[in-house]
Amino acid sequence: MLRSLVGSEMCIRDRLNTIQVKGRLEIIKTPGDYTLMIDYAHNAMSLESLLTTIRKYNPKKIYCLFGCGGNRAKARRYEMGEVSSKLADLTVVTSDNPRNEEPMDIINDILIGVHKADGEYVTIPDRKEAIKYCMEHAGAGDIVILAGKGHEDYQEIKGVKHHMDERDLIQEIIEGR
């Protein structure tokens, strides 16, 4: 009886050491010598926690790509812009789920917070192009974080959910599509 419990505990411990939750600090393999991660951080508190934690690993540079959902509190946009601008080396502002809002209106709200902290940033509304920008500019020792979408595999525009999985976008970029 004891032997079966010990065996089970060891299996559980081994499994816990290798478990990966989709969209939470999910590392995506790329041909580059930088680290690319997908995380669901979609508010200021989770983004601050993520960036503060990543900074402890002493990356050469942190790229933080994110957008904010439409038809949601505007304050979240300002706050996330400020947090990323303060804690990342480069903030890449893009589209998330604009829902029934214009993507550039959401991006402009995010930029209010970005400007408050006065960090370096670029604005690329098309999420695939924004990801491509990060992948092309990241270098050895850098960490690229794609924040906000996490496990989601869609982008909601004007009430319609369109398939969009960041993992697929990354693969398309790698393959030159």
Pin down the residues of each PLM region.
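Single conserved hydrophobic/aromatic residue that forms the stacking wall/gate
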Residues: 1-7, 11-12, 91
